[in-house]
A protein has these predicted regions:
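Acidic, glycine/GT-rich loop-and beta-edge segments that sit at the periphery of enzyme/chaperone cores
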Residues: 3-8, 90, 105, 109-122, ...
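Phosphate/ATP-binding catalytic cores across multiple sugar-kinase/actin-like superfamilies
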Residues: 223-231, 313-317, 446-468
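Glycine-rich phosphate-binding loop and adjoining helix at the ATP-binding site
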Residues: 196-201, 254-312
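Glycine-rich phosphate-binding loop plus the immediately following alpha-helix
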Residues: 187-221, 297, 301-317, 376-416, ...
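Fe-S ferredoxin-like electron-transfer domains
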Residues: 1-8, 32, 72-163
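Immediate flanking context of iron-sulfur cluster ligation sites
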Residues: 35-60, 67-93
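Glycine-rich phosphate-binding loop of actin/hexokinase-like ATP-binding domains
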Residues: 174, 182-200, 261-277, 312, ...
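Conserved phosphate-binding catalytic cores of ATP/NTP-utilizing and phosphoryl-transfer enzymes
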Residues: 133-160, 292-327, 348-360
Length: 568
């Protein structure tokens, strides 16, 4: 058995500085084996250390400082840190192995990203959905989506609640909502604890394939359990009708314990695409007993790159098309798509005709950059890795990068090729009232991400037949806080879409509620909404066309065309 050592953790942030007594910051005393790295104990105690590299020691984001009992630096640390930093006790949490009792200082509050958004802005004020029969038929079952943002103490009633979960790569957001009114009873949000294995899905796929799959599953289950524990204080047993979880394909596979190897290598095939239903006991291995038993639904995915979060968002925005039994790109009909198809009605056919010109585009400007375009009868989706360019970096959140880049262009400190002018080329530009510098490499990362997004939008538009797009919806936290004019200025969005862009907030979370509500409705009061919901979302999983941009002719040419920072 390995020797146990004690580790005193000193949190170095503004809050702890305000709480200091006699010049000593409050400390947390932890115990761990002397044979393992520091990262697991920090992770177990929710002391989040940012990581882009999946604990390989490449990114240097998990740096900590030993003030007592520093271990000898590893070869990797000698390569990544300066001699002065090593003498001062700085080490990398993912590779250093404390051998004796020690004291460690870690920076608090430095893991900055786009704020978590839980709101949804329905587009009813900008588009008259009632004039489109397809959408009108769906609105009849979605009165509960007239969401109220009230959070009063009197909102606990003797009826049922739905737990909605947005299982993001970066964050986890949960809400408990009244099943009938849609009223928010409680909200829980936290950073995704899997981030210690990397900030992107490819890092987590690699970690899972290297033996960390069960730990990744446990991490997210513990996160969900913390949310449920908070919600338990607001209800009595068996008041929850069900829970619906919407996440990208990798996050959902990791949660369900599926093999994710197929998501990271060609031909990129998910283990399962359709809607999943499991019991709460099965998901948590009978460890959750304080909220009663209820079904847990996992939103279906469309491909390895476009997951349940997008399907849920499309469901919330009434964008899922009605195929009417047509053969899809996958050469299968709606009727044989897992047996969930339904007959096309005369009303559907009439609505499809009225809906031909209502072309809408949904873009989720997050880590995975998912996009979908539809004319009401046909839908095409794709995704492109935006990576950490749209995530936090020190004091600079992703939306600030867009706005600051546009500002530098206007001031002439940055040219259209993305090159910083002197004297900023070597050192970068210091942000006002901050120690953060916006450097040349930050601009290059942003250029690559925005070029990939813009090229993806162009390919979807061309594949749909180059129609006039009536509306672009920006989903997620990044889109919610985005300065749209700055996005036009750098060429992230087409300039001819001015006046047609709408930030719609967290469509994944709202869609998880709407889908969970409709799926549970039949079991609560005998309505048929559940059957229709299953049909709608499974048709999305098996009937929507998906494009792999890496294999698409012309993508590289478009990517290079949109690399420049200019309005177009």
């Amino acid at each position: 058995m390995s020797e146990k050592i004690k580790i005193a953790i000193v949190i170095d942030d503004e809050k702890s500085n305000a709480d200091k007594k006699d010049g000593v910051a409050p400390s947390l005393i932890l115990t761990q084996d002397a044979s393992v790295t520091l990262m697991p104990v920090l992770l177990k105690n929710h002391l989040m250390i940012g990581s882009f590299c999946g604990q390989r020691g490449d990114c240097g984001r998990c740096i900590v400082q030993f003030t007592e009992g520093a271990p000898l630096p590893t070869g990797l640390e000698r390569a990544r840190l300066t001699p002065k930093e090593l003498r001062q006790g700085y080490r990398l949490a993912c590779v250093t192995r404390p051998r004796m009792d020690c004291t460690i200082k870690i920076a608090g509050g430095n893991d900055v990203e786009t704020p978590i958004v839980t709101e949804l802005n329905l587009p009813s004020e900008n588009i008259d959905l009632s004039s489109h029969k397809i959408l009108q038929s769906r609105n009849q079952k979605s009165d509960a989506m007239k969401f109220s943002e009230k959070r009063g103490e009197d909102s606990i009633k003797n009826n049922c609640y739905i737990i909605a979960v947005d299982l993001g790569t970066t964050t986890v957001a949960m809400q408990m909502r009244d099943m009938v009114t849609g009223e928010i009873v409680d909200t829980y949000c936290e950073n995704n604890p899997q981030r210690c294995y990397g900030t992107d899905v490819l890092s987590r796929i690699e970690a899972s394939c290297n033996g960390a799959g069960e730990e990744l599953r446990e991490l997210i289950c513990e996160s969900l359990a913390r949310g449920l524990k908070q919600f338990a204080g607001r209800l009595r047993k068996r008041q929850i009708a069900g829970m619906c979880i919407a996440g990208n394909t990798t996050m959902e596979h990791l949660l369900l314990g599926y093999d994710v190897k197929g998501l990271g290598v060609a031909p990129f095939v998910p283990v399962e695409k359709g809607l999943q239903k499991i019991s709460l006991a099965a998901l948590f291995s009978d460890r959750i007993t304080f909220v009663g038993e209820f079904p847990v639904y996992i939103a279906p995915c469309i491909s390895a790159f476009v997951g349940g979060d997008i399907v849920a968002g499309l469901y919330a925005l009434h964008m899922l098309p009605i195929f009417g039994g047509q053969e899809t790109a996958g050469e299968r009909t709606v009727e044989d798509a897992e047996g969930t198809g339904r007959e096309r009605t005369a009303e559907d056919a009439e609505g499809a005709g009225q809906n031909e010109t209502l072309v809408r585009l949904l873009i989720d400007l997050g880590t995975n950059g998912e996009m979908a375009i539809t004319d009401g009868r046909r839908m095409i989706v794709t995704a492109t890795a935006a990576g950490p360019a749209f995530e936090g970096n020190g004091d600079l959140i992703g939306t600030d990068r867009i706005a600051f880049t546009a500002s530098l262009l206007r001031q002439g400190a940055l040219d259209e090729t993305g090159l910083l002018e002197e004297p900023y080329f070597e050192t970068g530009v210091r942000m006002a009232k901050s120690e953060c510098y916006f450097r040349q490499e930050d601009i290059r990362a942003l250029q690559m991400a925005k070029a990939a997004i813009r090229a993806g939008v162009e390919i979807l538009w061309e594949e749909m037949g180059c129609p006039e797009v009536e509306r672009i919806y920006l989903a997620g936290g990044f889109g919610y806080y985005l300065d749209v004019e700055a996005a036009f200025a750098i060429g992230l969005l087409p300039s001819d879409m001015r006046g047609k862009v709408q930030a719609v907030g967290n469509t994944s979370l709202a869609g998880a509620f709407a889908l969970g509500r409709d799926l549970c409705m039949g079991s609560v009061n005998g309505e048929a909404a559940g059957k229709t919901a299953v049909s709608d979302v499974n048709m999305a999983a098996y009937g929507i066309e998906s494009i792999n941009l890496a294999e698409r002719d012309g993508f590289e040419k478009l990517y290079l065309r949109y690399m420049n920072l200019e309005e177009n």
